[in-house]
Curated annotation (Swiss-Prot):
Record organism: Homo sapiens (Human)
Topology with respect to the bilayer: Single-pass type II membrane protein
InterPro entries in the cross-refs: Ig-like_dom, Ig-like_dom_sf, Ig-like_fold, Ig_sub, M10A_MMP, MetalloPept_cat_dom_sf, Pept_M10_metallopeptidase, Pept_M10A
Name assigned to this protein: Matrix metalloproteinase-23
Side of membrane Lumenal, spans: 41-390
Gene: MMP23B
PTM comment, free text: N-glycosylated.
Cofactor(s) the protein needs: Zn(2+)
Length: 390
């Protein structure tokens, strides 16, 4: 994840990048942006767990605050799922912290920040998260790493970090579970802001961690401007989970009630009287799961022909599109099985301006299509069907 508007190499789950930052931030022309960033941010969602045995402690007379916005008017889908809809097969996830940041934050503060980020998701979903010792097995593995870390030098689709003021973090889609933070950054508890004294950006760990956790759960970037999973969430400062993320989780994991008393509460009229609480705990009983009509997948012109490629498992495959017509100022759009591909996903595929590279495996099997458009006119279309040979 990063602060810039650049398309990221989303970790095998994802990451956001900031490219417009650098050493020249002392320029006075950036003062308005710095003042804006200094005002961004909000405290993390308070811890609150609704276990089956804690019903009496919920205190329905006082509705706990929630970050979920009210109902929205019907609109088009803005969240994005992974092309293969990768997801976890259980909701009780464990995580371990393999390394801590070397700048500013202590291990204790780091644990507090990560716990707050996990609560943002557990408070609005069936997921629960529990930290385990570093030597124990876990679903999620979190670490703060230097530029060259793990297998980034030998993996074609897992990129290395780029030092300060570049990529902040990246995460891997399920079931990999890796969440990597750039140890060159200056992580803090509190809003992202620029430090004139240190001459560096101080980055809100809770905010970035919550974004990367969304990727680790299977969500890609949202097109909703105020979504936590938006590409520029760090720059814009939106720290609350939007309805977009909840709809994405519902489509990926199903719309589930979190308490066994939800049906009873719904019959007593709590769906209207305690709408926010019920939307968080009892979306199925109150029929809050899908409040707008889900569209069909993005339409793509049928390619005149589709080439089938049988590829050995593990091989890197590259498709090239529109090389001869780029001078006509056309824009290239990529699709997998008719679902639009907007970003790179390290560990799965790398998306360039006019080329697409994938690692041949069971997840990446399917039909890839590129469409070159100039405004509303389609200039050309190519399609490849990939089958993996074991």
């Amino acid at each position: 994840m990063g602060r810039g508007a650049r398309v990221p190499s989303e970790a095998p789950g994802a990451g956001v990048e900031r490219r417009w930052l650098g050493a020249a931030l002392v320029a006075l022309c950036l003062l308005p942006a710095l003042v804006l960033l200094a005002r961004l941010g909000a405290p993390a969602v308070p811890a609150w767990s609704a276990a089956q045995g804690d019903v009496a402690a919920l205190g329905l007379s006082a509705v706990p605050p929630t970050r979920v916005p009210g109902p929205l008017a019907p609109r088009r889908r803005r969240y994005t799922l992974t092309p293969a809809r990768l997801r976890w097969d259980h909701f009780n996830l464990t995580y371990r912290i393999l390394s801590f940041p070397r700048n500013l934050l202590s291990p204790r503060e780091t644990r507090r920040a990560l716990a707050a980020a996990f609560r943002m998701w557990s408070d609005v979903s069936p997921f629960s998260f529990r930290e385990v010792a570093p030597e124990q097995p876990s679903d999620l593995r979190i670490g703060f790493y230097p530029i060259n870390h793990t297998d980034c030098l030998v993996s074609a689709l897992h990129h290395c970090f780029d030092g300060p003021t570049g990529e902040l973090a990246h995460a891997f889609f399920p079931p990999h579970g890796g969440i990597h933070f750039d140890d060159s950054e200056y992580w803090v508890l509190g809003p992202t802001r620029y430090s004139w004294k240190k001459g560096v950006w101080l980055t809100d760990l809770v905010h970035v961690a919550a974004h990367e956790i969304g990727h680790a759960l299977g969500l890609m970037h949202s097109q909703h401007g105020r979504a936590l999973m938006h590409l520029n969430a760090t720059l814009r400062g939106w720290k609350a989970l939007s309805q977009d993320e909840l709809w994405g989780l519902h489509r990926l994991y199903g719309c589930l009630d979190r308490l066994f008393v939800c049906a009873s509460w719904a019959r007593r009229g709590f769906c209207d009287a305690r709408r926010r609480l019920m939307k968080r705990l009892c979306p199925s009983s109150c029929d809050f799961c899908y409040e707008f009509p889900f569209p069909t997948v993005a339409t793509t012109p049928p390619p005149p022909r589709t080439k089938t490629r049988l590829v050995p498992e593990g091989r890197n495959v590259t498709f090239r599109c529109g090389q001869k017509i780029l001078h006509k100022k056309g824009k290239v759009y990529w699709y997998k099985d008719q679902e639009p591909l907007e970003f790179s996903y390290p560990g799965y595929l790398a998306l360039g301006e006019a080329h697409l590279s994938i690692i041949a495996n069971a997840v990446n099997e399917g039909t890839y299509t590129c469409v070159v458009r100039r405004q509303q006119r389609v200039l050309t279309t190519y399609s490849w069907r990939v089958r993996v040979r074991g």
